[in-house]
Amino acid sequence: MGPDFEIERELGGLVAGVDEVGRGPWAGPVTACAVVLDPMQVPDGLNDSKKLSEARRDALAMQILRVADVSLGWASVEEIDALNIRQATFLAMRRAMDGLTTPPTHALIDGNAIPPGLSCPATCVVKGDGRSVSIAAASIVAKVRRDALMKELAVMHPGYGWETNMGYGTAKHAAGLHHLGVTQYHRRSFAPIAKILCG
């Protein structure tokens, strides 16, 4: 069984699903997305973005952007290094929520922690992208948009494999760091990068 609209229906009102992508990579921002779906226009096939092919994610993201209230929030590498990844993720989620056209009455947050300072009540939903279509939609748009950014950065900084690893720690990424060094898009607070900088 995939995600459904049950949690949203029980809560009533305007419910935003919120998810993030990019907590673990060595490079690039963390990206959050908030989505308020129209219950009459829920795209078919919504699921955890990790369970979908890239082509399917891209197609669904286009549909979601057409029929839903969607807002993205980003926290930069500098903010990640200054705040830590947990707090930077919360910041990105708040930015995503604040960017919605109509303020929601409730937020469903994927995971087990609610960002402080949200503009409405919120509920954590563990593995929410597999349970709530709103969170699934947010996970899809967040991943598609962050992946697109990492592919753009890969053109500017070839040799790290960002076009395929999206900034995560892979053998190619490690080899790129060894041969080419650290870029402005690397998270200096993350151990593999800090170790190189300490030399």
Curated annotation (Swiss-Prot):
UniProt cross-references to HAMAP family, sorted A to Z: RNase_HII_B
The name this protein goes by in its record: Ribonuclease HII
Cofactors (names): Mn(2+); Mg(2+)
Function description: Endonuclease that specifically degrades the RNA of RNA-DNA hybrids.
Annotated cofactor note: Manganese or magnesium. Binds 1 divalent metal ion per monomer in the absence of substrate. May bind a second metal ion after substrate binding.
Endoplasmic reticulum among keywords: no
CC annotations in GO: cytoplasm; ribonuclease H2 complex
Annotated positions binding a divalent metal cation: 19-20, 110
InterPro entries: RNase_HII (IPR022898), RNase_HII/HIII (IPR001352), RNase_HII/HIII_dom (IPR024567), RNaseH-like_sf (IPR012337), RNaseH_sf (IPR036397)
EC number per UniProt: 3.1.26.4
Family classification: Belongs to the RNase HII family.
GO molecular function, one term: RNA binding
Keywords (A to Z) from UniProt: Cytoplasm, Endonuclease, Hydrolase, Manganese, Metal-binding, Nuclease
The keyword Nuclease is assigned to this record: yes
Locations listed in the record: Cytoplasm
Catalyzed reaction equations: Endonucleolytic cleavage to 5'-phosphomonoester
One GO term (biological process): mismatch repair
Top-level EC class as recorded in UniProt: hydrolase
NCBIfam families: PRK00015.1-3
Native organism: Jannaschia sp. (strain CCS1)
Domain RNase H type-2: 13-199
